[in-house]
Amino acid sequence: GSTKNILKGERVALNILQRMSGVATLTNEFVQKLNGSKTKLLDTRKTTPSLRILEKYAVTCGGGYNHRFNLSDGIMLKDNHISACGGIKNAVSLIRKKTSFVRKIEVETETLDMVKEALEVKADIIMLDNMDLDTAKKAVSIIGNKAQIEFSGNVSLETIKSIAEIGVGFISVGALTHS
């Protein structure tokens, strides 16, 4: 192409490349903190508009894993869904009636009572959302191997190792792609 056209796109291309490099580097810093652990680092859907596929690719380049690309990739019942349905049992019951048995259902929990309710309805994945470490430790003990466990909320480079040590399978970090 012409020099003029190349120069027009140069800054945009460099900005995108720098952003993705930053995402991959930050992801790798988190992954290094998990070294020796079986816990996997996940991204979230909190991405820059129009850059989701690139940011999620950058996460994998940094050694992390993608959680979901979009809402259709998995069923995650968040606090507002649970409230609207009148509780976890009702929410999961409604979902099971409307979806294939092969779809995994993830339930966001904030308390030990919610964890127990998610276990009663046989949630496939239980997210411990914004729990303090002591409560999360108790939740992991209650869940055992009855469901996969994801920790989310207030995760930093300083806290990720201690979170992994309580036995969660996954830790999701929105800050990887959402600054």
Task: Please report, for each region that a protein language model flagged, where it lies by residue.
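Cys/His-rich Zn2+-binding cysteine-cluster or related metal-binding knuckle/ribbon modules and their
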Residues: L157
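Acidic/glycine-rich phosphate/pyrophosphate-binding loops and surrounding catalytic core
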Residues: G1-V121, I125, D134-I142, Q148-E150, ...
